């Protein structure tokens, strides 16, 4: 199996006595240690207008991480394309790919939080159309060495050559967040890699991987399990009381996230909004417990086809260390053959 990390940093607000940058600097050190522990990648979120300091300038922070590391893959999970000028985003992403020596994993999505679209004064109804148009522009920008133009519904560019070029050819790997069947089929149709969220229970993860594999193979391609990354929250070595407290914290975070994401009419059909706000649901999508308990859950994930797991360390850096040292070694072999 392969393991990366997933997450965010927080910048606290306050007066002159508050070090607002401490959380970001700690996150960079978290990534430096993750590389030393053998983690393969770091995927970082993009969110806006939360009120609790989530990462908004994802590529900026990843550039800093890239400068402090040498092998860690630098992933976005995800850049929400409807909010960005696609040519400018292509330039920024190419720059970090060059500076890092070709380590960018470009994760993209169309967004699901209503408050973010409202903050940017963009109708959520335009999300899919903007996403598809921007994605096409970005790929065109990365693969064209001569001037080109684009006249679309949302964007127009005339005679542009996007600089700099990317280090990876024809462009950095593209990962796409998806959960619903139609979205998963779209990922396969594009030939992209699949990012799966951190809340789905194991059986649902298996169904999504099976669908993606079927779609990939149905197009005459060989399925590579490393083209699917599954995110899981991890907290190692807890008492029963600590586990319940951690799960309650997880449920509260989900509720806070859903309040930000919900449309005024209550109609948000994103798959990430479909999970129950219960302790049972929280535990079903997490790897919480002793190393042995976590290993058992991880084996269940592997049994349904997951070979690449991104861990969001709810237990902090010590959990990251213990997971790497006490859980990962048992899963470092080759994947089992599946029919």
Positions of PLM-derived features:
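N-terminal beta1-alpha1-beta2 module of alpha/beta enzyme domains
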Residues: 1-74, 172
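Flexible, glycine-rich active-site loops centered on histidine and acidic residues
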Residues: 2-22, 83-149, 193-195, 200-206, ...
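Hydrophobic faces of well-ordered beta-strands that scaffold small-molecule active sites
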Residues: 3-7, 42-44, 74-76, 104-108, ...
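An alpha-helical appendage that flanks or caps ligand/catalytic pockets
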Residues: 5-7, 125-162, 203-306, 332-339
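Active-site mouth loops of central-metabolism enzymes
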Residues: 9-24, 79-87, 168-178, 234-237, ...
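Acidic (Asp/Glu)-rich catalytic clusters
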Residues: 35-36, 62-71, 93, 97-104, ...
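Conserved, mostly hydrophobic/aromatic
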Residues: 38, 46, 65, 96, ...
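Alpha-helix-loop-beta-strand connector modules within alpha/beta enzyme cores
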Residues: 52-76, 130-134, 324-338
């Amino acid at each position: 199996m392969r393991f990366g990390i997933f997450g965010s940093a927080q910048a606290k607000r306050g007066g002159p006595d508050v070090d607002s940058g401490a959380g970001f600097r700690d996150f960079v050190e978290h990534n430096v240690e993750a590389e030393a522990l053998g983690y393969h990648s770091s995927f970082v979120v993009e969110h806006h207008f939360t009120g609790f300091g989530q990462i908004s300038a994802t590529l900026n922070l990843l550039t800093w991480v890239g400068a402090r590391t040498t092998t860690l893959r630098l992933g976005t999970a995800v850049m929400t394309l409807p909010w960005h000028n696609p040519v400018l985003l292509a330039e920024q992403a190419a720059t970090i790919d060059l500076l890092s020596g070709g380590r960018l994993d470009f994760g993209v999505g169309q967004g699901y939080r209503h408050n973010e679209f409202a903050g940017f004064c963009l109708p959520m109804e335009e999300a899919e159309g903007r996403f598809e148009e921007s994605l096409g522009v970005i790929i065109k920008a990365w693969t064209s060495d001569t001037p080109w133009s684009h006249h679309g519904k949302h964007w127009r560019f005339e005679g542009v050559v996007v600089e700099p070029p990317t280090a990876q050819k024809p462009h950095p790997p593209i990962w796409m967040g998806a959960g619903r069947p139609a979205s998963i089929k779209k990922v396969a149709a594009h030939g992209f890699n699949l990012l799966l969220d951190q809340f789905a229970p194991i059986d649902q993860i298996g169904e999504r991987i099976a669908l993606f594999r079927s779609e990939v193979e149905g197009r005459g391609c060989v399925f590579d399990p490393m083209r699917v990354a599954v995110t899981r929250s991890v907290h190692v070595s807890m008492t029963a009381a600590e586990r319940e407290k951690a799960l309650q914290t997880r449920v509260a975070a989900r509720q806070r996230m859903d309040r930000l994401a919900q449309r005024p009419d209550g109609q948000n059909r994103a798959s990430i909004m479909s999970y129950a706000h219960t302790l049972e649901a929280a535990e079903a999508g997490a790897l919480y417990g002793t190393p042995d308990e976590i290993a058992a859950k991880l084996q269940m994930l592997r049994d349904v086809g997951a070979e690449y797991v991104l861990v969001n360390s709810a237990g902090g850096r010590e959990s990251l260390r213990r997971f790497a040292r006490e859980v990962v070694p048992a899963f470092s072999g080759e994947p089992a053959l599946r029919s």
